[in-house]
Amino acid sequence: MRTLEEVQGTLQIAKVKEEDLQPVTYCLSFGDNVSSGDYCLMEVDENLCKHIESGKSLIIRGDKDEHAVLCSEDKTYDLKIADTSNLLLFVPGCKTPDQLSDIPASPQLMHTQIWGFSNCYWELRRQRPRLKKLKKLLMENPYDGPPVGMQEEAPGLKYSMEDLLERIQASKEELEAHLGNVHACEIDGFWRILDFDYEMKLLGHVTQLVDSESWSFSKVPLSVCLEELGSLEPKAMIEHCLNCYGRRHSDEDNQVMYALDEDKVCRATAQLLLQNAVKFNLSEFQEVWQQSVPEGMGTRLDQLRGLALIDRSSKPETISLLRVEDLPEDTLERFNSLFSLREKWTQDDIEPYIQDLCGEKQTTGALLTKHARSSMQNGIKVYNSRRPVAT
């Protein structure tokens, strides 16, 4: 190990004035069997640092064919290796001048060992959770109601929350939120997505009961629904349907009530009508759609944002099913898919199909500026692809 005199001699050779430096000098040496593969360094922001210091975990998720992501309890981060021009040394106990409480007046030499080294580190960048795979897994075995009589439930894969966390690249909070978005429910410890026809059957039971009892859509009593419909379907499924299409609240007698969401009911009804047709005459569709929803509810085309695409250039005007969840998750692939469907888009038409691609503090306008080219057509701004569209 070096002595203080040797360090001072080195400074003289280098023509560095000792008074220009801090009085404490660290003399570094490599420990036994130190390897660059012993440690991985990761750059974290203040929030993640507090997360780790509080004793919480960070989890790396991804199958063998996927790019790894890092997840906290509520956020997902992209993991990338960043190279550095200088070698990074891992030196526990090495203090910066502001961390030294008592700075000695005379020069002092401190010996410490290097525990590891690396010329790269993991760089984290906040990203959207990759949730498209979730619906794909759940649709392997959709739930279409309890077995009838001696009939057994059709065999198929089932996934618990732990199973899904192993397969889906998302934090637990993001995963739980998306399970609610796709109307999944937990049955016997496994998360299941309802077959859409079965889901609409449940909704039909509820809306027919509301009509027969002349209830207000904003005051649907849970207890009566369960009592009246419990002989037709499992009570848990009736309550799940109310949770999907209504808002839970209590009346003045503290009775649990639901306020049915007009937009959600009308949107689901539209999907039922559109799913078996390639294209629908728009005016005819609007008429059938209004006739199909519960009396007292009003249909509007803005209820179909991200669900259906209207072609106003055709004669007559048409409407077809185009669900945002069926489009690619990757931004470039999403734009390529959209521009292969339609060469030019107005901002109002394309916005529902790219809104979910926006990162933190990013707008759809910024996305369009980056991935599309604008022009005027008949006085209306339209967007077309900046790149050749792959077919």
Swiss-Prot record:
GO molecular function: DNA binding
A single Gene Ontology CC term: chromatin
One Pfam family this sequence matches: Dcc1
Sequence intervals crossing the membrane: none
InterPro entries attached to this UniProt entry: Dcc1
Record flagged with keyword Signal: no
Cellular compartments annotated: Nucleus
Signal peptide: none
Alphabetic keyword roster: Cell cycle, DNA replication, DNA-binding, Nucleus
GO BP: any one term: maintenance of mitotic sister chromatid cohesion
Family note: Belongs to the DCC1 family.
Function: Loads pcna onto primed templates regulating velocity, spacing and restart activity of replication forks. May couple DNA replication to sister chromatid cohesion.
Subunit: Component of the ctf18-RFC complex which consists of ctf18, ctf8, dscc1 and the RFC complex.
Protein name: Sister chromatid cohesion protein DCC1
Source organism per UniProt: Danio rerio (Zebrafish)
